Curated annotation (Swiss-Prot):
GO terms for cellular component: chloroplast. Belongs to the intron maturase 2 family. MatK subfamily. It comes from the Eukaryota. It comes from Capsella bursa-pastoris (Shepherd's purse). Pfam families: Intron_maturas2 (PF01348), MatK_N (PF01824). PANTHER family: MATURASE K (PTHR34811:SF1). Keywords: Chloroplast, mRNA processing, Plastid, RNA-binding, tRNA processing. This is Maturase K. GO terms for biological process: mRNA processing; RNA splicing; tRNA processing. Its main location: plastid.
Length: 504
């Protein structure tokens, strides 16, 4: 990046176009396809999520394709001829897939420069588990215990393509880039409607950029209003993108909001609101009354419907009182548990009892949802009874055993922070018996005869897997004690929950 400052500077009047280097510059291809850009993005992985490139995507082919699209009668490709038109040995569907990859590379460069400039002069804390979803659990365990009301919001995604285009319009000043972006999206949807059995032709990197831009637009407005409506200024959210007419729209929104609903704005002022977002959902936690959460619910519905032109039903925003309801978040069912504690105090000759209530965050395992997932993957039936994994019988015995051990170990690590381990033991039992039935089916034997022939040493891998991990954390004497099964152990190395087989 430092070697080509003139080709990456987008602030000049002559270089406002995001696609300007894609049309006219050659150095951007070398930079984008080189591993140097990947190394830069990995260093900035705290704000960008990037995927690797496929070697079959050539930036030179993309440039020739764009030049061909500008020729006469080449701009619109009929849907019925999508699989028939060919260019350089590829079908027309492959064109849009390559364009989506290169488009994501181009638009990420100026955004990464803006984000990098916002962090200049600020010391960032180094963390070795930036991708860990478990890093949120200590926060939930420390903070949610002091709150009593949580607003659970399902973030809607726009179903119309123009909403995504309009969202990018506030950041992208170039009209030609937006028209080109709109053209690719509509061609993709036309092809998808033509053949719904095919998988998506757009690159995951491109789809991830669309989703992040949509969520960033929503969160920037939310945090801006949250900061203005609070007695104390929030400092946790530091990155805000620059957009055209953003502050003018916010002032207009405030003007309409204050004039029409003067009493509601005062009710939104609460400095003790915590915001967490994960996988298309977000929660707002507070220790105030449910009346405040009702006002925030009303705010979310109007924000999505008025600002983003999305039909957002109020049923997608749930108000949970942790003392009564369970909060389903991050694969756990969380609630507040009241533990009464009686303390005897004696002062001189008088003694009296003091009743104290201790509040703990009770995190349970959603056993029904996990059994449903295991049944969907043919590990058991819908009732939780283990069955053999027929698709794995062609593998070797060691491969089958290692797969089951990895799944069981990762589930044990993920749900080790649960306050009740009974459901975790049930899941382990299902996986162990499923492993035995799979091996017995492969060797054309019954489960009893198979276990009798091999002995109990077959299942030692399931039992010693946790021993090797926990012995690195606790002394052997502490591990041998029964207190370990009543302690919450948060593992900070689990990245994917669904990809249990491939995670090492």
């Amino acid at each position: 990046m430092e070697k080509f400052p003139g080709y990456l500077e987008f602030d000049g009047a002559r270089q406002q176009s995001f696609l300007y280097p894609l049309f006219f510059r050659e150095y951007i291809y070398v930079l984008a396809y080189d591993h140097g850009l990947n190394r830069l993005n990995r260093n900035r992985s705290f704000f960008l999520e990037n995927t690797d490139y496929d070697k079959k995507y050539s930036s030179l082919i993309v440039k020739r394709l764009i030049l061909r699209m500008y020729e006469q009668n080449r701009l619109i490709i009929p849907t019925k001829d999508l699989n028939q038109n060919s260019f350089l040995g590829h079908t027309s569907l492959f064109y849009y897939q390559m364009i989506s990859v290169l488009f994501a590379v181009i638009v990420e460069i100026p955004f990464s420069k803006r984000l990098g400039s916002s962090f200049q002069g600020k010391q960032l804390k180094k963390s070795y588990n930036l991708q860990s979803i478990h890093s949120i659990f200590p926060f939930l365990e420390d903070k949610l215990a002091h709150f009593n009301c949580v607003l659970d919001v399902l973030i809607p995604y726009p179903i119309h393509l123009e909403i995504l285009v309009q969202t990018l319009r506030y950041r992208v000043k170039d009209a030609s880039s937006l028209h080109f972006f709109r053209f690719c999206l509509y061609e993709y949807c036309n092809w998808k409607n033509f053949d719904k059995k095919k998988k998506s032709i757009l690159n995951p990197r491109f789809l991830l950029f669309l989703y992040n831009s949509h969520v960033c637009e929503y969160e920037s407005i939310f945090f801006f209003l949250r900061k203005r409506s609070s007695h104390f200024r929030s400092t946790s959210y530091q990155v805000l993108f620059e957009r055209i007419l953003f502050y003018g729209k916010i002032q207009h929104f405030f003007k309409v909001f204050v004039n029409n609903f003067p009493a509601i704005l005062g009710l939104l002022k609460d400095p003790f609101i915590h915001y967490v977002r994960y996988h298309g959902r977000c929660i707002l936690a507070t220790k105030d009354t449910p009346l405040l959460m009702n006002k925030w619910k009303y705010y979310f519905v109007n924000l999505w419907q008025c600002y983003f032109s999305l039909w957002f039903q109020s049923q997608k925003v749930n108000i949970n009182q942790l003392s009564k309801d369970n909060l389903e978040f991050l694969g756990y069912l969380s609630s507040l548990r009241l533990n009464p504690l009686v303390v005897r105090s004696q002062m001189l000759e008088n003694s009296f009892l003091i009743d104290n209530v201790r509040i703990n965050l009770d995190s349970k395992i959603p056993i029904s949802a996990i059994i449903g997932s295991l049944a969907k993957d043919k590990f058991c039936n819908v009732l939780g009874h283990p069955i053999s994994k027929a698709t794995w019988t062609d593998s070797s015995d060691s491969d089958i055993l290692n797969r089951f051990v990895r799944i069981c170990r990762n589930i044990s690590h993920y749900y080790s922070g649960s306050s009740k381990k009974k459901n975790l033991y049930r899941i382990k039992y299902i996986l162990r018996l499923c492993c035995v039935k799979t091996l017995a089916r492969k060797h054309k034997s019954t489960v009893r005869a198979f276990l009798k022939r091999l002995g109990s040493g077959l299942l030692e891998e399931f039992l010693t897997g946790e021993d090797q991990v926990l012995s690195l954390i606790f002394p052997r004497s502490y591990y041998a004690s029964k207190r370990l099964y009543r302690v919450r152990i948060w593992y900070l190395d689990i990245i994917y929950l669904n990809d249990l087989v491939n995670h090492e």
